[in-house]
Amino acid sequence: MHRAGLVRLVRMGLVYLLVAAAAALGWLWHALPGEICLEPGQTLQLPRFAWVEPLRGRGSRNVASTRAVGSYQVTLALGGWLPVRTIRAVVTERPTVTVCGTPFGVKMFSEGALVVGFSDVNTAAGPENPAKAAGLRLGDRVIRIGSTATEDNDAVKQALEAAQGSAVEVVYVRSGEQRQTSLTPVWDASSAQWRAGMWVRDSSAGVGTMTFVDRQLGVFAGLGHPISDSDTGESVALRSGEIVPCEITGCSAGTAGSPGELKGHFLSAHAIGTIRINGENGVYGTTRTHFSGQLREIAFAQEVVTGPAEIWATIEGETPRAYRIQIERVSDADPRRNMILRVTDPALLAKTGGIVQGMSGSPILQNGRLVGAVTHVLVNDPTRGYGIFAQTMLEQAQQAAKTDHAA
């Protein structure tokens, strides 16, 4: 009986070990990147997964040094023996860009009119709100009313006037999905016009930080996150946009629960670049303007590690300065939040309290290479924030160049 119980315990222990091992391998499979970049002659190493290497017996560990530029399948294994995941290794020349850290102004016009508020219309029958009655919500983007394409606020007004109180079809976009509804404008005697009871916005403006410029392609990358509407938080759907010169004139320091902000103003209405993409990973566009900065290599995503680094930020005037930070965490799981950063530089902490709005796009450098850009501040701890890989931003910038050629 005693022996049978012992055997049962051993079996249960083995089952638990197998389950734990399977869970660990599953976690590792998801944690490993599905694709990595290497330059010719570079050994395939994953500093964040030191115990993982290419499966032995199936090609050289130095994948790049024995092969030409191209794409290859590589099986990664624990200790080189236990296969975990097959990934794609892209062998390419290491890119070099002009790292900036300078402020720029943004002027954008949206694709459609964004609903940013509602207000009842006083009619002879009492307060009414046709927009709400039609089911419209904050953040909806109205792209057509009747036969009128609503590219701006004036077009919305003209379409409502043309309806003359009759029901009209409204085409709008919500969460990326195009929808239709029917709306009946009402007469506002106080303003002598037909109204829908909604406030709309067709443009946006602000200040951000330029991460880098690729002079060879004639493209720029900045912010590290999309330009969003200040009232709804919705990303602005780009119809057209440009960047202009800007200088920082002041700063409100951040505190726990209250993010700070850089204050600036446009120096000129003359555009120095055209925005082509307002995406989840930043603002990208084309430019023929010479931007000041330093030529630096871009670190591939797997080369970014925890430890000391620096950001280039402009908190006064137009000239950036380097400030010390610590990269506390690196992950491939969320393409918009690859790093968690902590400001350690006393000078920056004294002036801004850490990371503030307007610093988004500030370049992050480690071991002399551009590894990423600041994207967001942690609201409850302004000394800490998020960052995105520079490799991701470069891929988006290259897409902006293709968009320009297609146009």
What name fits each language-model region?
Residues 63-67, 144-177, 381-383, 388-391:
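PDZ domains, with a preference for the canonical peptide-binding region formed by the helix
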Residues 105, 109-133:
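PDZ/PDZ-like groove recognition
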Residues 131-154, 364-367, 371-376:
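Conserved PDZ fold ligand-binding element
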Residues 182-357, 366-367, 375, 381-396, ...:
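Serine endopeptidase catalytic core focused on the charge-relay Asp
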Residues 8-28:
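Hydrophobic membrane-insertion alpha-helices, especially the h-region
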Residues 76-80, 85-94, 157-197, 406:
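PDZ-domain C-terminal substructure recognizer with occasional recognition of PDZ-binding tails
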